[in-house]
Amino acid sequence: MSLTRLLIRDFRNIETADLALSPGFNFLVGANGSGKTSVLEAIYTLGHGRAFRSLQIGRVIRHEQEAFVLHGRLQGEERETAIGLTKDKQGDSKVRIDGTDGHKVAELAHLMPMQLITPEGFTLLNGGPKYRRAFLDWGCFHNEPGFFTAWSNLKRLLKQRNAALRQVTRYEQLRPWDKELIPLAEQISTWRAEYSAGIAADMDDTCKQFLPEFSLTFSFQRGWEKETEYAEVLERNFERDRQLTYTAHGPHKADLRIRADGAPVEDTLSRGQLKLLMCALRLAQGEFLTRESGRRCLYLIDDFASELDDERRGLLASRLKATQSQVFVSAISAEHVIDMSDENSKMFTVEKGKITD
């Protein structure tokens, strides 16, 4: 599925824009601060309900306006789908699909699987475990129909359990929460483990092409001890959890550990190599989705040329083209992306929030 049309109104520094898009490569060229990243962010927000540069809604809505409006048309193999998202300064959202209101942001996310590559995306590799959990959970969300509901219920139960830890004195008082929590935790952990095992070959193959000089390993850590039942872990750690006033073990502590030549990648790789690894992982994830479901990702790449030399840019471009996916690329200069362009591409110029093609 590709985004054939995008309407942006009062988003960041963009007053209004109506863009007819290519199903292949779309290039956004302009100086820093021109608004090219805002276009990428608008697409991301349309598919996620939130921006990737700021969680503060007031910074995303254009100055002195009350709300932003985003509309898109998605073209699939058999049908076209109209989608829309409006969000006001109070953070209230309205999702519209094919002319009807009352839909959830998760429905947009399912319709628009996308991969985001930005200069800030190094957190996937050198940030905390939550970023790598998000990587795994993206895959589980798009591969397991029941994942989102289970994950939402898990978050709710953990919040309730942590609140109860401030009041209870005996483990038996926690059993009502744990009775619901344990099967959810085990199911989510199983899905994550299966996903990490399934995508392992894709990650390995892509990383060997991007970083052949390193031996990279990936290991899923579920968040509690191996070969130990989660019920046993919760009961055994009750006193410690009560002192901490939060649940110290579980799927909310899971991680995907990534090592290069046996050492953490953040201690071994340069910034350019970290970007290559990040790109390799995002590509592997998108390609795995296509192979498993027949659905293609939409790729958003901000500041394409940063951290990469000509050879590595060429490698990334060729791999992106091979996916046959829709790709959006921002760059300061057209020279950085001209080699990627073909007769099906579209080149947009962005200046002070105005977009022309």
Curated annotation (Swiss-Prot):
Q: What is this protein called?
A: DNA replication and repair protein RecF
Tell me which UniProt keywords the record has, alphabetically. ATP-binding, Cytoplasm, DNA damage, DNA repair, DNA replication, DNA-binding, Nucleotide-binding, SOS response
| NCBIfam families listed in its UniProt record | recf (TIGR00611)
Provide an example Pfam family for this protein: SMC_N
Q: What does this protein do?
A: The RecF protein is involved in DNA metabolism; it is required for DNA replication and normal SOS inducibility. RecF binds preferentially to single-stranded, linear DNA. It also seems to bind ATP.
Q: Which organism is it from?
A: Shigella flexneri
Residues forming coiled coils? none
Q: Which Gene Ontology molecular function entries are recorded, alphabetically? A: ATP binding; single-stranded DNA binding
Indicate which residues the UniProt annotation says bind ATP: 30-37
Q: Its Gene Ontology biological processes? A: DNA replication; DNA synthesis involved in DNA repair; double-strand break repair; SOS response
* One cellular-component annotation, GO: cytoplasm
